[in-house]
């Protein structure tokens, strides 16, 4: 699940590329069941979404650490 600070924000607001040096290349929604490649900037993240990230391992680990 996404870090709580990501929930109910759209990708443009999060600006992950500039802030964390990672890209969201896909999102798997659980409700409704959907897999979206290259989600649009206005996509709003929900608590049960699964984010597929592209970036350096250390940068992705930093995103994962936000969940703790």
Model-derived features: where do they sit?
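Cytosolic Rossmann-like ligand/nucleotide-binding regulatory domains
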Residues: 2-67
